[in-house]
Curated annotation (Swiss-Prot):
UniProt-listed InterPro entries: LpoB (IPR014094)
Species of origin: Sodalis glossinidius (strain morsitans)
Protein name: Penicillin-binding protein activator LpoB
Keyword Membrane: yes
Keywords: Cell outer membrane, Cell shape, Lipoprotein, Membrane, Palmitate, Peptidoglycan synthesis, Signal
Endpoints of the signal sequence: 1-16
Known role: Regulator of peptidoglycan synthesis that is essential for the function of penicillin-binding protein 1B (PBP1b).
The organism's taxonomic lineage, starting at the top: Bacteria, Pseudomonadati, Pseudomonadota, Gammaproteobacteria, Enterobacterales
Family: Belongs to the LpoB family.
Record's compositionally biased regions (Pro residues): 23-51
C-alpha cells in the first residue's frame, strides 16, 4: 500500500513538471534609421482684432459731494463736543458699482478734519468689533439696526448711516445721523454726487 501511494505520488510529481520547449532564437535587432528632420514654417500670425477698452470707471469727487452734507450735519444743535461717532460703511443701492470704501473714507476724513464736534471711531477698532460680532467688512446687507448694534458695542453715542442710491452715473447720497441710545434719526440730508 505504501508502495502504491509512493508510486502515485511520484507520478503526480512527474506529471506536474513541464518540459521546457526549445528556446526560439532571439529576434534580430534591426537598426532604426535616423529621423528625417523636416523644417516646419510657422504659420503667419493671424490678424487679431484690437482688444476692446474696458469701460471707464466713473470717478466721483467724494470730498466735494459730501462736504456740504457734513457741514449741515455739524450745524445740528444739541450734540456735545467730543461725542463718539461711528461712521458706518456707505451702502450701495445704485444700479451699478460705486466705490463705497472711498466714499466712507472721505466722509470720515471730512468729519475728523472739521474739528472737535465728533470723535470718530477708528478703522482698526471698527474692524475688530465687526469680527467680534461676526459681521463682514463688505456686508452688502448693511442695515440701520446692524449699524446701531455695532455702535452700541463700541460705546458710540451717534451713528452716521449713509447710502448711495439711484443711477450709478450720478447717485443720490443720503446721510442720517442717529442717536444710538434710542435709534432716533436726529438729522438727515441728501445730495447728488459730483464728478
Amino acid at each position: 500500500m505504501k508502495k502504491r501511494a509512493l508510486i502515485v505520488l511520484a507520478a503526480l510529481v512527474l506529471a506536474s513538471c513541464t518540459s521546457r520547449k526549445p528556446a526560439s532564437p532571439p529576434a534580430p535587432i534591426e537598426p532604426v534609421p535616423p529621423p528625417v528632420t523636416v523644417s516646419v514654417q510657422p504659420p503667419p500670425p493671424a490678424t487679431s482684432e484690437p482688444v476692446p477698452m474696458p469701460p471707464k470707471i466713473k470717478t466721483i469727487d467724494w470730498q466735494a459731494s459730501l462736504s456740504p452734507l457734513v457741514q449741515q450735519m455739524l450745524a445740528v444743535e444739541g450734540i456735545n463736543d467730543g461725542s463718539v461717532l461711528l461712521v458706518n460703511t456707505m451702502k450701495n443701492t445704485t444700479n451699478g458699482s460705486v466705490q463705497t470704501g472711498k466714499a466712507t473714507a472721505a466722509l470720515t476724513r471730512l468729519i475728523t478734519d472739521a474739528g472737535g464736534k465728533f470723535q470718530v471711531v477708528g478703522a482698526n477698532q471698527l474692524n475688530a468689533a465687526r469680527q467680534m460680532l461676526g459681521l463682514s467688512a463688505d456686508d452688502s446687507l448693511e442695515s440701520r439696526s446692524k449699524a446701531v448694534g455695532l455702535a452700541r458695542y463700541l460705546n458710540a453715542q451717534y451713528v452716521l448711516y449713509s447710502a448711495a442710491a439711484g443711477d450709478v452715473k450720478q447717485p443720490t447720497l443720503d446721510l442720517q445721523l442717529m442717536l444710538v441710545q434710542t435709534g432716533e434719526i436726529i438729522w438727515s440730508g441728501n445730495g447728488v454726487a459730483q464728478d
